[in-house]
Design a protein with these regions (language model features):
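A conserved beta-strand element that flanks and buttresses the S-adenosyl-L-methionine
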Residues: 105
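Short catalytic micro-motifs in class I SAM-dependent methyltransferases
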Residues: 108-109
Length: 200
């Protein structure tokens, strides 16, 4: 897999976070944590802070990311703490999920794909969640002006309310919009959804 510009930038960010010891859950991960149970797929896990927190709460976690830097760190932590985490480097644009999970999580990932890929991967995550399980998805949405980490020719800003529409046939447990300042005068506009798959 050839690293994309965004993967290289995240490698740099992760290296800086490790140097600074900044391993706190971000606000979206903190929101997700109470909904994680059973076997968890963390799709775009970054440094694995959420995967570690979930494993400490009794979950088993499959954690995937395109950053070798991040996965190397997570493997080290999981081994050191004897946590049930399988951490793998994967090209998440094309990765095929081959098992069902009790929880699927994708925080801050899908916007780095072109739109057809983002939608296809979202549908794949939906289809590999067991009935009664939770999906936790966080994306950048239209209105975002912070684009410096995104490939100009291949990114996806979801429409406002689009996540809720894509989960209309599930029970929506949480649907939040939030904004954060980016660099300069830019804005990051996010939507986060937690949805329960019908069944059980």
């Amino acid at each position: 897999m050839v690293p994309t510009t965004s993967v290289r930038r995240f490698d740099e960010q992760f290296a800086r976070q490790l140097r600074e010891g900044d391993l706190r859950l971000n606000p979206f991960e903190a929101t997700a944590l109470p909904y994680l149970s059973g076997r968890v797929l963390d799709y775009g896990c970054g440094l694995g802070n959420l995967a570690v927190a979930a494993a400490r709460r009794g979950c088993t976690v499959v954690a995937l990311d395109a950053s070798a830097e991040a996965i190397g760190h997570l493997r080290h932590v999981a081994a050191e703490l004897a946590l049930p985490i399988e951490a793998e480097v994967a090209d998440l644009r094309t990765h095929v999920v081959r098992e069902a999970f009790d929880t699927v999580v994708s925080i801050g990932l899908l916007m780095f794909f072109d739109r057809p890929t983002a939608i296809a991967q979202l549908e794949q995550l939906r289809s590999h969640l067991r009935p009664g399980g939770h999906a936790v998805v966080n994306v950048l949405v239209e209105g975002t002006t912070w684009l410096e980490m995104l490939d100009p020719s291949a990114h996806c800003l979801f429409g406002r309310g689009e996540l809720a529409r894509r989960f209309h046939d599930w029970t929506i447990v949480l649907n939040e919009s939030s904004e954060y300042p980016g660099s300069g005068d830019t804005i990051k506009s996010f939507e986060t959804i937690v949805a329960s798959k019908p069944g059980n």
